[in-house]
Amino acid sequence: MPSNQTNLLQGTLDLLILKALALEEMHGLGISRRIEQVTRGTFVVKPGSLFPALHRMEEASWLVSSWGESENNRRAKFYRLTAAGRRRLETETDQWRRISVAIAAALEAT
């Protein structure tokens, strides 16, 4: 693994997927690309991690999917947030902010 890439911390994948879908529906490759883009290449989500997570999140009713056509005219499954998914995004965002503050405090402790 290149040195500029980091393994996803446990629990962050859901947050990143939900955030990627917050503005618009996307297919799997679009979600992966968006996460890589917004994290400036720090997180690269491989299909073996992404698609099981999408399936699990759809089972939890955080996402719904429908078949459509991708930008290169291929059939693709598009995912979008549900109301429950938006609530989950808020919850996960709040939790991550609390964790970030706590870790920053720990790193600055002498």
Regions found by a protein language model. Give the residues of each.
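Intrinsically disordered, low-complexity and often Lys/Arg-enriched segments
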Residues: 1-2
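N-terminal helix-turn-helix DNA-binding core of bacterial DNA-binding proteins
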Residues: 6-51
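Glycine-centered, phosphate/nucleic-acid-interacting loop/turn motifs that mediate DNA/RNA or nucleotide
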Residues: 61
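Short beta-strand "wing" residues that participate in macromolecule-binding interfaces
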Residues: 65
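Conserved catalytic-core motifs of eukaryotic protein kinase domains, centered on the activation segment
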Residues: 69
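Basic, amphipathic "hinge/linker" alpha-helix immediately C-terminal to the N-terminal HTH DNA-binding motif
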Residues: 72-93
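Amphipathic alpha-helical dimerization/coiled-coil segments
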Residues: 87-110
